[in-house]
């Protein structure tokens, strides 16, 4: 979910829609439905990545203001216990050479606000977590992830300040230290989401080079609300969701050539599976500003916007399967699907829960 949309609609809130509308959108009960079981112990678990070993996942909780700042937490799959591993203002570590922009020397303050995240094994063998951050600064924060099994910790190592006037959303890393990031919209002038999802071009993808310490725009990525992104392991191709266009594009980075495109309703975050396919979170197609505003006005429970998690074949650029779909309880507005073994974990940009879906037999 793009930051500018979240903040704009949160500001409109109940004053625009009325408390009855917001309440009607809320799912309060925390009970299983079919093969999906909600775990109601979170605050806006917008994005997540699998940790090595398959015993835990790392979740980024998304805040929208000084009152609801974000954090990073580890969720243990067997015990279902969660542990906060990073909050802004708590790190005393200094920036480390080779981790981001040398001009970024201080860790985030207490206004830290996690958005899109990605995890990569660097060429030097260390695990690097990249976090889009909006609170104390618009930047990609770089953390080292250390541990094993269910015992994990993170340490801040550096950051890369965002390009001027860019509201970033998602990030996709390469092992050599380079990464790609989506600019959903400019910071100024603000894009109007009050009536519907924009259909005009609002952003693109940036590539950041560890060697040059600089950004460049990736050709062929101008789109209506660029959102989720993953990269091929060698960094040759990127797969970008364009929420306002209902599409996922495959673009060759070096040339800006569009290799393929798939139609996906209101696509959000993307995640690789172990067998080399891409999971796309897809919200209902014809969302209005009122729909989304009702969601961010919810103070308890979960949003009920219909969504599905679909499977993209990255070679043919076709949707080959719907892994999960729901309209209402036990959770709506899914923004990321992460497969770990025979289970699917789903997060949301606004609400108190994640979904744990049993995929055995699928």
Residue ranges and their predicted role:
Residues 24-33, 200, 308, 313:
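Blade/loop signatures of beta-propeller domains
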Residues 25-44, 99-102, 154, 320-325:
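A short helix->beta-strand "capping" segment at the edge of beta-propeller domains
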Residues 42-53, 68-69, 91-121, 156, ...:
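Beta-rich, blade/repeat-based domains predominating
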Residues 58-93:
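Beta-propeller domains
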Residues 59-70, 131-132, 181-200, 281-304:
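Short, conserved, GDST-rich strand-edge loop motifs in beta-rich repeat architectures
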Residues 76-80, 145-149, 208-213, 252-256, ...:
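Short loop/turn segments that connect beta-strands within beta-propeller blades
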Residues 264-323:
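Loop/turn-rich, solvent-exposed surfaces of beta-rich toroidal or solenoidal domains
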Residues 333-362:
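Blade-level signature of beta-propeller repeat domains, shared across WD40, Kelch, NHL, RCC1
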């Amino acid at each position: 979910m793009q930051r500018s949309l979240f903040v704009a609609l949160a500001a409109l809130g109940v004053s625009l829609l009325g408390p009855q509308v917001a309440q009607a959108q809320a799912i309060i009960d925390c009970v299983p439905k079919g093969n999906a079981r909600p775990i109601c112990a979170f605050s806006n678990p917008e994005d997540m990545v699998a940790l090595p070993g398959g015993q835990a996942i790392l979740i980024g909780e998304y805040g929208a203001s000084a009152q609801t700042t974000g954090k990073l937490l580890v969720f243990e799959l067997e015990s279902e216990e969660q542990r906060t591993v990073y909050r802004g203002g708590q790190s005393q570590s200094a920036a480390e050479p080779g981790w981001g922009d040398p001009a970024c020397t201080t860790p985030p303050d207490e206004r830290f606000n996690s958005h899109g995240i990605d995890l990569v094994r660097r060429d030097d063998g260390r695990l690097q977590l990249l976090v889009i951050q909006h609170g104390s600064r618009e930047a990609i924060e770089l953390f080292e992830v250390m541990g094993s099994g269910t015992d994990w910790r993170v340490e801040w190592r550096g950051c890369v300040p965002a390009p001027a006037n860019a509201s970033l959303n998602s990030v996709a890393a390469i092992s050599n230290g380079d990464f790609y990031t989506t600019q959903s919209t400019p910071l100024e002038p603000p894009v109007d989401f009050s009536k519907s999802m924009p259909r005009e071009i609002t952003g693109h993808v940036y590539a950041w080079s560890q060697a040059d310490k600089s950004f460049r725009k990736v050709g062929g990525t101008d789109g209506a609300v660029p959102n989720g992104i993953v990269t091929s392991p060698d960094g040759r191709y990127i797969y970008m969701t364009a929420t306002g266009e209902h599409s996922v594009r495959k673009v060759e980075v070096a040339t800006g050539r569009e290799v393929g495109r798939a139609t996906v309703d209101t696509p959000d975050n993307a995640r690789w599976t172990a067998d080399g396919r891409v999971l796309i979170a897809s919200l209902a197609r014809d969302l209005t500003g009122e729909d989304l505003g009702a969601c961010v006005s919810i103070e308890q429970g979960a949003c009920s916007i219909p969504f599905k998690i679909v499977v993209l074949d990255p070679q043919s650029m076709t949707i080959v399967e719907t892994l999960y779909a729901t309209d209402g309880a036990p959770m709506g507005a899914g923004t990321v699907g992460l497969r770990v073994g025979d289970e699917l974990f789903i997060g949301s940009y606004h609400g108190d829960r994640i979904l744990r879906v049993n995929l055995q037999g699928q």
